[in-house]
Structure formats: structure tokens, C-alpha cells
């Protein structure tokens, strides 16, 4: 299928300005890397997502979904087919102690809404830079909390465009993982069950976690957060630091001097710079300590020709 035809058709389905050709994906990731998307669409509701999926299935066009791009490296060759950004699907409702949040809502914003309603349970998320969908996809967590602790169910869309409601058990949550890495479901919304709390206590905890994050993490540079999962009985950052790798740079990307678990884009780095540095760190740590660091960040897209 000719991508010009795909662009022209989807332009009749989505609002004006929500379909683009050859969109640079570095503009849609936190680390500011990534090549072009053949066709880039940003639906505003579930019906538009279904229309894109059905059209893509009809003509066998590959589809890639993006949240807010906080925990992903898109290769320099970009993404073929249709790239679907979910950043406009951002509704959040509160009923009693239940919050229902759509996939594109920032999990930080949801934690603040919980605070506004004196609800406790999402304080840990006050510094996580991902979307709700991304947070469920990887069972995001920090400071002793994680999404699986508060999620009760979620609405997903299958690869055929069918809506389903799944209970938490169906997610098969583990440490920084869920079943969604192995199926073709799209997370559309999540239902969180929280508890009534005291506003001042909730805010104090969030302020404390924010201070810890700002004092320890290199927020002054683009990054994708923690690059590696925590190995059993150890810390990725400590292993990297003890390997003497802080400040190690490949191209425009370096291991942060502030927190060794982060890799920061300090000088117009590329996706390949990130990938090469990740491999170098993994190889060095394994040689020194016999520990294989497992990536937490996702790598998608095509290599640059």
C-alpha cells in the first residue's frame, strides 16, 4: 500500500492536523532520538483508533502505538507503516475512591488528581514521567510502589479493534513487565482503587519523593529514565558506577555523572549512540561482575540505512 494513499485516507477519518507524513519521531520521545514515521496519527477517541486498526488490517499495514515516549528508544531509521500516538486520549474521572484514567493521561497528573481528592495509593507515581498506558505496560513503579498494587481492571482493544475489559489477574504482572509485551492488545483505560487519606499526609509524601527524585536524577538532560531493570539482590546503577562507567560517552550520549542508572542525551545523540552505549555497559558489567543487566527501556523501529 502506498503511504501517500494511507495518509490521504486517514486524513478523512481524523481531525485536521492529526495525520502527518514523515513525522520526526524524536519530537515524540523524551530522549529526543528517532527517525521518521511513514504516517503518524494522533486519534482523539476510541472510535478513531478502531478506524485506524481496521484500515491497517484490511491492507496489512503495520501499526505501532506510542504513549508519551518516556521509556522507549526509536531507532534512527524510524518506523514503517502507521505510528499511532495516544497522547490525546487523556480523560480522567473520579468516583469515590475509584479513578478511571485513559491511556494517554500522564501518570504524574493522575497522582496529582488523587491528591486533589484526598486519595492515597498513587503517591509513588508522582515522579514517573510515563503515560497511564505505558505505566500498565511495564508495571511502572518507584519507591516501593507499583501500578499492580492499585489497578483493579483495564479496558483494552484487541488487534481486531474489539473492546475488552480485563481484570488485574489477566495482566500477569511481574517486575517491570506485563502480558502486553507478548500480545497485540492496546491499553485504553485503567481503573485504580485507592483509599481515603489525609491531604497533608499525601502531599508530604509526594513532596518527599519529588525531592528525592530531583536530587538524585539527571533531570536537566533528556533521558529515558532507568535504562536497566534492577538485578536480583543488587542495583544496576551501583554496578555501573563500580565498573567506572560514569561519564562514559558514545557520540552524544553518556552515562550520567549524577546517577549511573541513567543515560543522558548531552549533545544531539542518536538512537544508535544509545544502543551502542547500552551494549557497552552490559558487556563491561558482565565482564567485571558476572551480572547480565536486562534492559528496562524498549527499543523499536528500523536501523538507519
Swiss-Prot record:
One function term, GO molecular function aspect: FAD binding
Region forming the signal peptide: none
InterPro entries reported for this sequence: FAD-bd_PCMH, FAD-bd_PCMH-like_sf, FAD-bd_PCMH_sub1, FAD-bd_PCMH_sub2, MurB, MurB_C, MurB_C_sf, Oxid_FAD_bind_N
Cofactor list: FAD
One matching Pfam family: FAD_binding_4
E.C. number(s) listed in UniProt: 1.3.1.98
Active site: 176, 226 (proton donor), 296
GO terms under biological process: cell division; cell wall organization; peptidoglycan biosynthetic process; regulation of cell shape
Keywords: Cell cycle, Cell division, Cell shape, Cell wall biogenesis/degradation, Cytoplasm, FAD, Flavoprotein, NADP, Oxidoreductase, Peptidoglycan synthesis
Name this protein carries in UniProt: UDP-N-acetylenolpyruvoylglucosamine reductase 2
Catalyzed reactions: UDP-N-acetyl-alpha-D-muramate + NADP(+) = UDP-N-acetyl-3-O-(1-carboxyvinyl)-alpha-D-glucosamine + NADPH + H(+)
Enzyme class: oxidoreductase
Subcellular compartments: Cytoplasm
Domain FAD-binding PCMH-type: from-to ranges: 33-197
Domain of life, source organism: Bacteria
GO CC terms, sorted: cytosol
Known role: Cell wall formation.
Key word NADP present: yes
Similarity comment: Belongs to the MurB family.
Pathway(s) where this gene product acts: Cell wall biogenesis; peptidoglycan biosynthesis
SUPFAM superfamilies: FAD-binding/transporter-associated domain-like, Uridine diphospho-N-Acetylenolpyruvylglucosamine reductase, MurB, C-terminal domain
Cell division recorded as keyword: yes
UniProt main location, coarse: cytoplasm
NCBIfam families reported in the protein's UniProt record: murB, PRK13905.1
